[in-house]
Amino acid sequence: MGIQHMLPSTQTAIIAGPQGEFQLSHDVPVTPLADDEIIMKTAAVALNPVDTKLVGDFITPGAIFGFDCAGVIVAVGPKVGNGLAIGDRVCGSARGMNREKPLGGAFAEYVMLPADLTLRIPPAMTFAEAASLGTALVSACMSLFWTMQIPASLQEPAEKPFPVLVYGGSTATGTMLLQVLKICGVRTLTTCSPKNFDLVRSYGADEVFDYNSPTCAQDIREATRNNLKYAVDCITEDSTIKICYSAIGRAGGQYIALNPYPEHLATRKVIKPGWILATLITGEGSAWPEPYHREPDPEIRALAKPAYSAVQKLLDEGRLRSHPIRVKDGGLAAVLDGVEVLRKGEISGQKLVYCFN
């Protein structure tokens, strides 16, 4: 039998209005507790670029927006077997704008998360820091371990260092990738603007290149002696795929983007391109329009479990930290303003986080 505090029947949440607009509603149902999930009372949420891009056919009117969140567990499903308990401080990535589970988004007073994809927050980490981890962690692990399948893992570091390029190392996913790769014993190369060189080095970058330099790709190729096999593109624009493709060595390799990439620029046959969709981590597939639509794939969820166990250990040991954050108060009402700030491109090098009272 599950354990839970007495939960209200309704809550305040940010949902999609009839025209797909962000709408603050005070009578949104609280999601029923599933057997293998937990419900937390939200303490903080973080914004991601994807939050501003869900429009048109991505929208399900009445569904809750938002992905990254942190809070305190108030309900535990009867089949939760990983020791999570009421009162635990936790974080994760929720099911934002999900057609099949419209009450699953993060921008709400109460959020349900799969227990095996939920992380306990270490005592030294704040709710605000923890709220910023979810999507970046998922994207990093999906890119490296399940799509590229690099010859290293969080549990078994590389026997011999090999280079991996992270294009856009100063992004939230970029700094997470750098940390994860460093733990895996990998030689980390990244691109960013010179003003962020010190930032990416502090997150584990071994070598940093100015993406504005006309010789950026050539410099990376020379630094890796024409042997670079792996590139993760956190930006995914025409110019970024060109640099990544030019930087990968003569023998080819893999290029992974965080968004659908421009296929006409995937010009080298010796390079295997691909892209990831972080929301697939649950194994439940995606009802979003093409090219984002996916059928359920339980294997993804099965692969995620050991990775999450390894990540939990690293968090407990203080070996993973959040991207620089800009913390705002005001709860859900203020999140609406944050979405506009993000949409206008008025924040750089930081992740917007909103704390609840």
From Swiss-Prot:
It comes from the Eukaryota. Keywords: Antibiotic biosynthesis, NADP, Nucleotide-binding, Oxidoreductase. GO terms for molecular function: nucleotide binding; oxidoreductase activity, acting on NAD(P)H. SUPFAM superfamilies: GroES-like, NAD(P)-binding Rossmann-fold domains. It is an enzyme of class 1 (oxidoreductase). Pfam families: ADH_N, ADH_zinc_N. Monomer. This is Trans-enoyl reductase buaC. It comes from Petromyces alliaceus (Aspergillus alliaceus). The gene is buaC.
